[in-house]
């Protein structure tokens, strides 16, 4: 199904995903080995529940590249709506970045603090938040430490850090 899993209990998530997996197995005569979050929407509860269901990999809908050090349970999957977009999106390189949790970044549906760790060589980059656009940011020792007060404008908000070498890392922040 395409249920918004973030609105379900752990038991309901498991039930929904197992039912969908069984439907796929019945129709295709093959076990579903990979999972993609419906509409790209997920939170920590969804991640932990899906990880327990024995999938080989889990895909999100965050724009970005994948590398050998990518988390197999949080792989970027590019949504492409026009052929012209494909070349642009495939040009992104993987940016290894350690993001804070949603609760460390957001209070009352406002982005308050962002502390992202990446390569010490990166001194400046661009930061994007849905509905607020791109802005130039400086990093110290590969760390972006930014205090902001930006409202999450949508139910699903994307946040990206992009270097001037076209390396990209991003996260999805759900509005509560």
Q: What residues fall within each predicted segment?
A:
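Generic serine detector
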Residues: 1, 9, 20-21, 36, ...
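Terminal accessory/targeting
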Residues: 80-176
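Active-site-adjacent pocket scaffolds in enzyme catalytic domains
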Residues: 47-105
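Repeat-unit-sized solenoid/scaffold elements
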Residues: 36, 58-60, 64-69, 75, ...
């Amino acid at each position: 199904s395409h249920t918004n899993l973030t609105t379900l209990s752990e038991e309901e998530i498991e039930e929904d995903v197992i039912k969908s997996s069984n439907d796929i197995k019945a129709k295709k005569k093959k076990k579903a080995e990979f999972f993609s979050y419906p509409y790209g929407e997920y939170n920590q509860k969804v991640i932990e529940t899906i990880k327990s269901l024995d999938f080989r990999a889990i895909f999100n809908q965050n724009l970005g590249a994948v590398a050998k050090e990518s988390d197999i349970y949080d792989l970027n999957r590019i949504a492409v709506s026009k052929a012209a977009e494909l070349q642009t999106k495939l040009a992104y390189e993987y940016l290894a970045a350690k993001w804070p949790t949603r609760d460390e970044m957001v209070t009352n549906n406002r982005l308050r603090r962002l502390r992202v760790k990446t390569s010490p060589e990166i001194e400046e980059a661009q930061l994007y938040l849905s509905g607020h656009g791109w802005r130039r940011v400086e990093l110290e020792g590969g760390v972006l430490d930014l205090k902001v007060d930006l409202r999450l404008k949508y139910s699903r908000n994307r946040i990206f850090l992009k270097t001037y070498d076209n390396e990209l890392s991003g996260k999805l922040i759900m509005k509560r």
